[in-house]
Amino acid sequence: DTLLIRPDGTFSQEIVIPGVKNAFFKVHDGKDNPHSYLLYLAPDKSLHVDIVKKQDHIKLVYSGDTGPETDYTNIHRETVTLSQKFSNNTWRDIPDFDACVKYVDIQLAPVEKALTKVKNQTFVAQEKQGWKKMVEMLYFNYAIAKQQAGVDMRKDKDFMEFVNKINFNDTLQVAAIVPYIDWYVTANPDLYKKDEELPIGAVKIRVLGELTQDQGVRNNISKTLLTAQLFPQMLGADISETIPFVYREFLKISTDPQLREMAVKQLKIIDNTTPGTLAASLRM
């Protein structure tokens, strides 16, 4: 919807929603593309937004019932997602893992401060639950960036101490597994090449099988890894050469009945359409 501004500079909108929702709010400064913000909306709760423009800078000030949640959500988004504070170039300039931990703490301090102003304890609990996952992801992103820049993070004592504390059989620590695998295969580019040339997606699933014996974790993460390998196909990419290897590794460790059935069917289709395969009517 487009909100019309009254002659006195105010605007308002009443929105009926069934539950809590984050909505994009775009503000056009008349020059560049619209600036987008996130509004935290909740049924029967008010949110006030003051748009303050000073020269070429636009600042939004939030108040009302969900003002603190909205303020936190935008500070989090601006710090973690939109800024370059956690980009590969930034990571590569940080000398070691100990410095990385301190840097992350400093950059996330304003986000933590904004969360302390939120009185909605359900919201706070949900954010704190995801906080550890986010920080672990940032640590592994740092390790991957350094590894790609030629730094062997396996020799960083503090980083390996952090890695060795992760229990990969614990379902509560499952969020750390995918970024760990991403780093591990980056640090070990010759995995399994002595036996066979596996595509990276298949390598990741095989590493998962060696990393954890917990079947729930295996099913959860193998589904995530398989989905990541199938996603390019949705965008029109040809994955026909790599996906059979991925399916076969997936079938070795997953017990998910629906996904296993899908993988088996897809492998049969691939095998039946591979050049050089006899048509069904010609098979003896």
Q: In which residue ranges do the predicted regions lie?
A:
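Alpha-helical repeat scaffolds
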Residues: 150-165, 199-211, 240-251, 260, ...
